[in-house]
Swiss-Prot record:
The lineage of its organism: Eukaryota, Viridiplantae, Streptophyta, Embryophyta, Tracheophyta. Belongs to the eukaryotic initiation factor 4E family. This is Eukaryotic translation initiation factor 4E-2. GO terms for cellular component: cytoplasm; eukaryotic translation initiation factor 4F complex; nucleus. Component of the protein complex eIF4F, which is involved in the recognition of the mRNA cap, ATP-dependent unwinding of 5'-terminal secondary structure and recruitment of mRNA to the ribosome. Recognizes and binds the 7-methylguanosine-containing mRNA cap during an early step in the initiation of protein synthesis and facilitates ribosome binding by inducing the unwinding of the mRNAs secondary structures. Key component of recessive resistance to potyviruses. Residues 1-20 have a biased composition (Basic and acidic residues). According to the redox status, the Cys-120-Cys-158 disulfide bridge may have a role in regulating protein function by affecting its ability to bind capped mRNA. Displayed sequence is allele 1. Disulfide bonds join 120-158. Gene3D superfamilies: RNA Cap, Translation Initiation Factor Eif4e.
Length: 222
């Protein structure tokens, strides 16, 4: 892993410095036009990503035991350029600053971070665990690897989620075709390499998780 991430210069850096974060995962501007200004076509020389991506936030204060799973997840912002990614990323709380119980997602646009989404339905996820407050850098590197199309089997990737809990944080990388063992193992190995992560990581099918909950076993490990 490199010691420092070299961030592209944001063309809107002077604007984003004036934005405030109202709550975990939400950007608030001084006017209704704040968010739309991120995608202003008059801003020249932005670097387009291969896919558009959407940040989603699951606010722990909006959850209840009676509510259906995923009912409190809401989209935050969709970006499609390198510059807009940094504009958003630099103005939201990183995992170490999120409240316990929060889930923050980054998925390809039009894919919802839910098992029920048609693209995710037959998929699964790789998961890495970290001590509380220790996942910030690996979360960023995961995002950069995804949006930068660094995975050989990148078409298999749906998105990633960071789960913040009392004693630990977990980053999960969701993929679309769990039965494609070759692709999933390739993704798992590359992910570990990108993050310089030395512990074993496991892959669980969403279908197993739905049926067995925490009793679901890893189908693949790297």
């Amino acid at each position: 892993m490199v010691d420092e991430v070299e961030k592209p210069v944001s063309l809107e850096e002077s604007k984003t410095n004036t934005r405030e974060v109202e709550e975990e995962g939400e950007i608030v501007g001084e006017s209704d036009d704040t968010m739309s200004s991120l995608g202003n076509p008059s801003m020249a020389m932005k670097h387009a990503l291969e896919h558009s991506w959407t940040f989603w936030f699951d606010n722990p204060s909006g959850k209840s035991k009676q509510a259906a799973w995923g009912s409190s997840i809401r989209p935050i912002y969709t970006f499609s350029t390198v510059e807009d990614f940094w504009s958003v990323y630099n103005n939201i709380h990183h995992p170490s600053k999120l409240a316990v119980g929060a889930d923050f997602h980054c998925f390809k646009n039009k894919i919802e971070p839910k098992w029920e989404d048609p693209v995710c339905a037959n998929g699964g996820k790789w998961t890495m665990s970290f001590s509380r407050g220790k996942s910030d850098t690996c979360w960023l590197y995961t995002l950069l690897a995804m949006i930068g199309e660094q995975f050989d089997c990148g078409d298999e990737i749906c998105g990633a989620v960071i789960n913040v809990r009392v004693r630990q944080e977990k980053i999960a990388l969701w993929t679309r075709n769990a039965a494609n063992e070759t692709a999933q193992v390739s993704i798992g190995k590359q992910w570990k390499e990108f993050l310089d992560y030395n512990d074993s990581v496991g892959f669980i099918f969403h279908d197993d998780a739905k049926k067995l909950d925490r009793a679901a076993k890893n189908r693949y490990s790297v």
